[in-house]
Amino acid sequence: MYHVIIIEDDPMVASINKQYVEVTPEFRVDRIFKNGSEALPYLKTNPTDLIILDYYTPVMNGGEFLDALHNAGLTPSVIMVTSANDTDIVRSLLNRGITDYLVKPFEYTRFKTALDRFTETKKYLEHSHGGLGQHDIDRLFSVNDQRADAKPSLAKGLNETTLAMIREYLQNNRN
């Protein structure tokens, strides 16, 4: 079971996020906090796997919270769920190591994708013993990039059936 906290100052949004998290039985929301300042003491004594974090919270914003988290030596994964969409803010948060970033409003399916990515990465790292090779690291990064699993697109006017027929023809007519 993954232990989750939510840092969100809007009670309605916090409640929705909690419901979204708990749809998946692997996750349990242990606490909801209105700001990062309230959450830090809790995090120092309670192991937490994942934080759902809003950027715009009172007392300290999401970036300040991530700095405080790092300074305390705490390393839970963080999914931003926020209305903050300014390029500088997004860049700053990415540089602080967030796991995913959802801009409000969003669909449940996007939230679920973020949780699935977290779970997949966490499980992969838990089952990897020793050092990771380049292939392993590529797999970790492809978890966060759906394009890595996508098939290359075919040229316009070419589909899988036609391509298979061409391959078969070439194989049968090798000289």
Would you name each region that the model predicts?
Residues 106-115, 130-136:
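C-terminal output helix
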Residues 35, 61-64:
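Acidic catalytic/metal-coordinating carboxylates
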Residues 8:
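Conserved acidic carboxylate
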Residues 135-175:
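C-terminal output/effector regions of signal-responsive regulators
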